């Protein structure tokens, strides 16, 4: 059984506090984009969970979130059968686009159908939260306000068909490390989430592009100054606004039209030769 597992960007990311377990309390606007991995799962003749992937640098053992999802799903519903999971990877790894989380989300949804468990999306999201804070959102997808550590999800009016160029530099970033180095007391200006939501409801891409904000840039851009150059190059190439997604290092920019986006894409691809560059669009939701 096959399914597309879509990437996400953060249109806003704010940290407003910290829990006793050191997880940050967040307010984020998440958005699905039309860049996806393909997850294919079939039952196996034994009780093993095996993972294969078209990219050699993706771990295929218990470190992979898709593997963790399969283990948790089997434990939760007392399933003995094994599964073979194939991941066709297109979403960049360690990029701040929820590549691992969206794979885990797809595994839960597929196994729910494959084994005729018929668990509700809410139950799947509860299992997903044990894997990672982005997994519940990845199960739901679309345009959403995510709060708590990311598990409190309020769907928003779809902000679809917005053109963006996405650039993932040729290095990864540790999400854990970024959050460890984030000092909430040093955040001078918090994100105007309500203003952004209002603008998105009014389909005001210009306001959104100029006012989107990610407080994790304070950490990641300090360590990787090339990201500032990428943002500046995107703006010079005609972007309405550019920002880092999640903990980074991926940077994305919104564009008014496809021609400008195409030119920016060509320029960025030429300048940042060892980076992954994509043109994509925001989409309404997953096809879960």
Swiss-Prot record:
Biological process, per Gene Ontology: isopentenyl diphosphate biosynthetic process, methylerythritol 4-phosphate pathway; terpenoid biosynthetic process
Entry keyword annotation includes rRNA processing: no
Gene this chain is encoded by: ispE
InterPro entries attached to this UniProt entry: GHMP_kinase_C_dom (IPR013750), GHMP_kinase_C_sf (IPR036554), GHMP_kinase_N_dom (IPR006204), IspE (IPR004424), Ribosomal_Su5_D2-typ_SF (IPR020568), Ribsml_uS5_D2-typ_fold_subgr (IPR014721)
GO function term, MF aspect, one: ATP binding
Function: Catalyzes the phosphorylation of the position 2 hydroxy group of 4-diphosphocytidyl-2C-methyl-D-erythritol.
Name assigned to this protein: 4-diphosphocytidyl-2-C-methyl-D-erythritol kinase
EC number: 2.7.1.148
Record key words, sorted: ATP-binding, Isoprene biosynthesis, Kinase, Nucleotide-binding, Transferase
Catalytic EC class: transferase
Binding site for ATP: 92-102
Reaction(s) catalysed (UniProt annotation): 4-CDP-2-C-methyl-D-erythritol + ATP = 4-CDP-2-C-methyl-D-erythritol 2-phosphate + ADP + H(+)
Superkingdom assignment: Bacteria
Active site: 8, 134
Gene3D superfamilies: 3.30.230.10, GHMP kinase, C-terminal domain
SUPFAM superfamilies (alphabetical): GHMP Kinase, C-terminal domain, Ribosomal protein S5 domain 2-like
Family designation: Belongs to the GHMP kinase family. IspE subfamily.
Pathway this chain belongs to: Isoprenoid biosynthesis; isopentenyl diphosphate biosynthesis via DXP pathway; isopentenyl diphosphate from 1-deoxy-D-xylulose 5-phosphate: step 3/6
Membrane-spanning residues: none
